[in-house]
A protein has these predicted regions:
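S-adenosyl-L-methionine
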Residues: 1-20, 34, 56-85
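Short SAM/SAH-binding signature in class I
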Residues: 86-94
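Conserved SAM-binding loop of SAM-dependent methyltransferases across substrates and taxa
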Residues: 29-41
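Class I S-adenosyl-L-methionine
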Residues: 2-7, 80-81, 86, 98-219
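Conserved class I S-adenosyl-L-methionine
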Residues: 19-28
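Conserved SAM/SAH-binding beta-strand->alpha-helix loop
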Residues: 51-53
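Conserved SAM-binding motif I beta-strand of class I
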Residues: 44-49
Length: 219
């Protein structure tokens, strides 16, 4: 039986480059790995996790879905399980923003023009991940807001171009989520955090002015 994906992983699956190998890093129970493998759209599907326990559960998920022969499971830390050029897309779902960029930093081959598409679903600190990616030469392909288990997530796809940009606070806060029907709900959720964030920003600073403008728009 094929596992059912929540809104986060469904959106992530839709952003994977078809016709190219894909890796699901931090695959946990292997639900996304199984769905990708069963689709037949990818010549190679790799599921990887740092811990043997989740990897064993991923194997069981693949067996139950009848696609164990169409996926490869690897035990290892982050992108160390991959070699440069091996996959066209890498999914990093369910880890923090900081963990995501630390994983990327440890694999310099990712930050190359023509490198893999990164599909990320940060569990926290969406704004900080957007800023880090843009400041390190990645360009936005998609930024989709989704709601799962009562929380908002941003499913981001980025590719390296080498063009470094310095985004505004507003760009980091909302990304390109406004083009989606769910964008208004995501924006309201992000804005709700601002009063607390604003407390630590000195009055009169450019950041304070930008935050105040966003708060005023929301009233």
């Amino acid at each position: 039986m094929l596992p059912t994906l929540d809104a986060r992983l469904t959106a992530a699956a839709e952003l994977v480059r078809p016709g190219q190998p894909v890796a699901d890093i931090g695959c946990d129970h292997g639900k996304l790995t199984a769905v990708l493998a069963a689709s037949g759209k990818y010549p190679k599907v790799i599921g990887a996790d740092l811990r043997p326990g989740p990897l064993a559960k991923a194997k069981q998920t693949l067996e139950n879905a009848g696609c164990l022969d169409r996926a490869e499971l690897r035990l290892g830390d982050g992108l160390s399980v991959l070699s440069a050029g091996e996959v066209g897309s890498i999914v990093l779902a369910g880890v923090s923003a900081q963990t995501t960029w630390e994983i990327i930093e440890k694999a310099p081959w990712v930050s190359a023009v023509g490198g893999p598409r990164l599909i990320m679903v940060p569990a926290t600190r969406h704004s900080e991940l957007r800023r880090w990616l843009w400041q390190h030469g990645f360009a936005l392909v998609a930024d989709r807001p989704v709601q799962a288990a009562g929380r908002w997530y941003a499913v981001m796809a980025e590719e390296y171009t080498g063009k470094v940009t310095e985004p505004t606070f507003t760009q980091c806060l909302l990304g390109d989520t406004g083009r989606w029907p769910e964008g208004a709900g995501y924006a309201a959720w992000q804005r709700a955090k601002l009063p607390r964030m604003r407390l630590g920003v000195p009055d009169g600073s450019p950041l304070a002015a930008e935050m105040d403008a966003i708060l005023k728009e929301g009233n």
